Design a protein with these regions (language model features):
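Transmembrane signal-anchor helices characteristic of membrane glycosylation enzymes that use polyprenol
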Residues: 3-30
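Extracytoplasmic catalytic/substrate-binding loops of multi-pass membrane glycan-assembly enzymes
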Residues: 21-39, 46-64, 70
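Membrane-interface starts of transmembrane alpha-helices
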Residues: 70-82, 105-108, 153
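Transmembrane-helix motifs of polytopic, lipid-linked glycan transferases
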Residues: 81-101, 137
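Transmembrane-helix signature of polytopic, membrane-embedded enzymes
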Residues: 92-116, 149-152
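Short acidic/glycine- and proline-prone juxtamembrane loop motifs at membrane-interface regions
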Residues: 122-132
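Specific aromatic-rich, kink-prone transmembrane helix
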Residues: 130-148, 161
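Membrane-interface alpha helices of multi-pass inner-membrane proteins
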Residues: 152-162
């Protein structure tokens, strides 16, 4: 029974980002999507037109756009896919962090709820996604450094926090 319970929540977490947004009665915020797509497109060609506080996100988004262009994937679908991949990564890392302290019966429903909130908020690779990626990865290395008493992990944590 416990295995079926875990399997149900894991499947639910995996399906939430894959659901089409139109079925949730949300519209796409064209202004933010257009702003971010242009930032990603122009970050390598015209740095004067990019918003410098989002420099790292622009570099990541520009690299992703180049990869999607090579693979002939439409840019918007590619950025939604990148968002889903980052969300899966964040859920996996959160699970790895919390599994030492809590049981699966509490962690998996909380992660599914967090995934629903993330899907309702925005389902496109933007600065919030990049910041969450960097912050949680840094937190993971920091907790590993403190708990396992490995000072080398502090270097990785500080790199992601910067």
């Amino acid at each position: 029974m416990k295995r079926t319970y875990k399997f149900f929540w894991i499947i639910l977490i995996a399906l939430i980002p894959l659901l089409p947004s139109s079925g949730w009665n949300f519209s796409i915020d064209v202004s933010d999507v257009g702003f971010n797509m242009n930032q990603y497109r122009f970050c390598f060609t015209d740095m004067d037109s990019t918003y410098l506080p989002l420099f790292l996100t622009n570099i990541l988004g520009g690299c992703l756009l180049k990869v999607f262009g090579i693979l002939h994937i439409p840019a918007y679908i590619g950025m939604e896919t990148a968002w889903a991949a980052v969300c899966f990564y964040l859920c996996f890392l959160s699970y790895r962090l919390y599994v030492r302290y809590r049981e699966d019966a509490l962690i998996l429903p909380a992660l599914a709820f967090a995934m629903v909130l993330a899907k309702c908020n925005f389902h496109f690779f933007i600065y919030n996604t990049a910041v969450a990626f960097m912050a949680l990865t840094g937190l993971y290395f920091l907790i590993r450094a403190v708990n396992d008493k490995k000072s080398g992990m502090l270097f990785f944590a500080s790199a992601f926090f910067m």
